[in-house]
A protein has these predicted regions:
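A sensor for short, sequence-defined functional sites
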Residues: 1-400
Length: 400
């Protein structure tokens, strides 16, 4: 008979199984369920509220059938194969071949169409048709990538991806009762531990917009965490050196590095900005620290390599407010980190859900003027609880 799987969010749901002649009756009930407010950042109700999920699906069978349907459309693609050999000849290193094909598809094949779980697999488009039309949905673009990579001698696998971050609250009910929640197709390269098909032409090989999301390995039929290649994780790291003077003025040296999706965003920005727009960008950057800030020398943006780098030095006349024997100032760049952990209110009735990673590293080296000592540095240690992980530490080192 048909395999029947079910799962219920444990808190507040009562499950009963009754044998009735030649049938089995299942029932679920929940009582006194409170009305929940619609708060910013609230996770889907099925993650924490009384919910029943029923399925007759099987991920292994789903994966085999989806892989076969996608692979079938990669065959008989002479135009895609010809283009791949032209873009990525055997004289190129294999990573250069991959980058040439990935960049071409990202630049010339416009994303358009429904999500993977919104269309029948019979609607998948052959690789050469997508190549000619210049657009395609996630599955169509994955098929074209697969056909071109195969022609270039690159091993690949198809992976189905969701929009959900991989967390116990999300994966537990999905493992117990399989659901078709897969919205896009990625192309995985085993030899490079990299995923393709969800980033643009300005991304680095190894980064993915599906970072830490729930995926399905079509080969094994198992749920997995989609991870970027080492050093492909999305992150921003900024180091500030602040030379503070007794009159409140300061010189600020900043060095920022961009990885993964932030690299893609900044790389695209600096490639597509006009000189006037670039000037406006740096004016806005300085004004974010102080309206009186002036650049000392020319700021440097280096995004042709990886990671992307941004360097600048500012002279700020009134960086710190002089109040008696005290100098008071705010740390530049800290608002980006504080915005990540704010919950929009002081109290909540529902969990706060962050559906993806966000990594920001800030380092401050502050040179104090003579006879000044740091005070009011905030808590010794602060940490957010489950399911997220975020911590703040302080370390004060006196100059010798």
């Amino acid at each position: 008979g048909m395999s029947f799987k079910h799962s219920a969010t444990p808190d507040g749901v009562i499950f009963r199984e009754v044998l009735d002649s030649d049938r089995v009756r299942y029932s679920w009930s929940a009582a006194d369920v409170p009305q929940l407010p619609s708060e910013p950042g609230r996770p889907p109700l099925w993650m924490f509220a009384p919910t029943v999920v029923v399925s007759s699906g099987d991920y292994a069978a789903f994966g085999r059938k989806l892989s076969a349907a996608l692979t079938e459309k990669t065959r008989n693609a002479p135009k895609a194969a010809e283009l791949a050999r032209k873009l990525a000849p055997e004289t190129m290193r294999i990573d250069e071949r991959i980058n040439a094909i990935r960049t071409w598809v990202a630049r010339h094949i416009r994303p358009a169409g429904p999500a993977l779980n919104e269309l029948p697999w019979s609607a998948f488009t052959p690789a050469d048709v997508t190549l000619q039309s210049g657009y395609g949905d996630s599955a169509d673009r994955a098929i074209l990538l697969g056909a071109m990579l195969k022609a270039a001698g690159v091993d690949y696998r198809f992976v189905a991806a969701t929009e959900l971050g991989y967390a116990a609250a999300a994966t537990r009910p999905l493992m117990r009762a399989p659901q078709n929640i897969f919205t896009k197709v990625l192309v995985y390269l085993p030899g490079f531990d990299s995923h393709l098909n969800d980033t643009g032409e300005y991304a680095s090989l190894g980064s993915t917009a599906s970072e830490e999301a729930i995926g399905l390995s079509l080969d094994t039929g198992r749920l997995m965490t989609i991870r970027p290649r080492r050093k492909g994780e999305s992150a921003t790291s900024c180091a500030y050196r602040i030379r503070l003077r007794a009159d409140g003025s300061a010189q600020i040296e900043a060095s920022c590095s961009y990885f993964g999706l932030p690299y893609q965003s900044m790389h695209r920005k600096f490639k597509e900005m006009t000189p006037a727009e670039s000037d406006q960008f740096f004016e806005s950057l300085a004004a974010g620290i102080s309206q009186e800030a002036q650049y000392k020398g020319k700021p440097v943006a280096a995004f042709d390599g990886y990671p992307g780098k941004l360097y600048f030095t500012l002279e700020v006349p009134h960086f710190a407010m002089v109040s008696g024997d005290y100098l008071q100032f705010s740390l530049p760049g800290f608002s980006a980190l504080s915005n990540m952990v704010k919950t929009a209110s002081s109290t909540r009735r529902t969990p706060l859900w962050r559906n993806g990673p966000a990594k920001t590293v800030l380092e401050y080296r502050i040179e104090m003027p003579g006879n000044f000592v740091p005070v009011g540095l905030g808590p010794e240690r602060f940490e957010l609880g489950r399911p997220g992980t975020a911590a703040f530490y302080r370390h004060v080192e006196e100059a010798s």
